[in-house]
Amino acid sequence: MSMLGTSMDIGVSETELRSALKLLKPKASPYPLIRLGSAGDGGYLIPDDLDGVVACFSPGVANSADFELALTERGIRSFMADFSVSKAPISNPLFDFEKLFIATFNEPGKFTRLDDWIDDKKQLRGGGGDLILQMDIEGNEWPILADVSYETLSRFRIIVMELHGLDNLLTNPLGIGIFESVFTKLNGLFSVVHLHANNCCHSLEYRGVKIPRVLEVTLIRNDRYSVSGKLYEPVIPNSLDSPNIPNKPELQITRDWLS
């Protein structure tokens, strides 16, 4: 994220910052939240709306596939991509791993766009069912989310991802523009239903607001509200939340993010 400068550069106003935060304000979920994956890093809260989900796409694997393993117990296949490792951390017949980086361009054998990675899956052609996107790619989520088509996004029922570099994005005029563009795009199809700060890193206090450097975000596609007909108000922190690093205290999401 160095191209965005630092929080000491030109800076953004408190009004601009608080306006941007409204794009991440959690809304009531049409389904109760459940936790899938480990008790620490690798576990996430998502809506309990998995019937009819046929696959999960997971850019960024590293050494954890606990979330994807939990999905296999529900018969959901996971497609994984990570060029930094040679194989999935655990073996499972419902895992499909490729040594690839997800990017905004294609280079055979190393880089592929998110749209093309998904379109390439013969197992999903001609069939119905929704998808999940679970993404933890160390800051590359921003260009990828800007690049992905609305057609591909609309195939995801649930998105759970880690946002990196928020301390730079939300305090820098260029960065906050990227943030607003990406979440305006996402909010056209999805609603944020949960936030959890990753305690791997400290928060930055800027304009009176504590900004986690890494934030877990859960979204659900807006058409799922009409299917459910119910609403479950956001509870943050949630009793199902767990610190990513067990021996460090949780980072709290302040009311600035919730109001």
Q: How should each PLM-predicted stretch be described?
A:
Residues 1-259:
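Phosphate/nucleotide-binding beta-alpha loop and adjacent structural elements of enzyme active sites
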